[in-house]
Regions:
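Juxtamembrane boundary at the C-terminal end of a transmembrane helix
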Residues: 119-129
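Membrane-embedded alpha-helical transmembrane segments of multi-pass integral membrane proteins
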Residues: 14-17, 21, 84-91, 113-120
Length: 129
């Protein structure tokens, strides 16, 4: 079995995007003087925190379904959807930090990619002999 390099790169990109959201929370803590363990503060801090939390919640679903789709269906299509998912998460984060009502397009992109990956994983699993 060959090493699935492209899915590994997608996974790394997703984890880097998550780490970026964590760093944004740290920056917002410093800028707005929100000391740990506080989880509330000015709206810009809370928006950054919500981006990080939601991204973590989405990663829990994305990573397993992405790898199942890549291994059991199509590595190429799964990787393409994975890269688009990462872009959607970045757009979600940027939009949310600009204004909470601007988070929709990024969320929609990443959500649709997750659903497509889920369908690929299910079809791939049931097509195995």
């Amino acid at each position: 079995m060959s090493v699935p390099a492209l899915p590994a790169v997608v996974s790394l990109a997703a984890l880097i995007a998550y780490q970026g959201s964590a760093m944004a929370v740290g920056q917002a803590r410093v800028k707005h003087k929100v000391l740990p363990p506080a989880m509330s503060g000015p709206e810009p801090f809370e928006c950054a925190l919500r981006v990080q939390q939601n991204t973590l919640e989405q990663l829990v679903f994305f990573l397993p379904v992405f790898w199942l789709a890549a291994l059991m269906s199509s590595e190429t299509w799964a990787s393409l959807l994975g890269f688009i998912w990462v872009g959607g998460r970045v757009a979600y984060g940027v939009g949310y930090r600009m204004a909470p009502n601007k988070r929709g397009p990024g969320f929609g992109i990443s959500f649709l990619c997750s659903i497509a990956l889920l369908v690929m994983a299910i079809l791939g699993a049931f097509s195995q002999r």
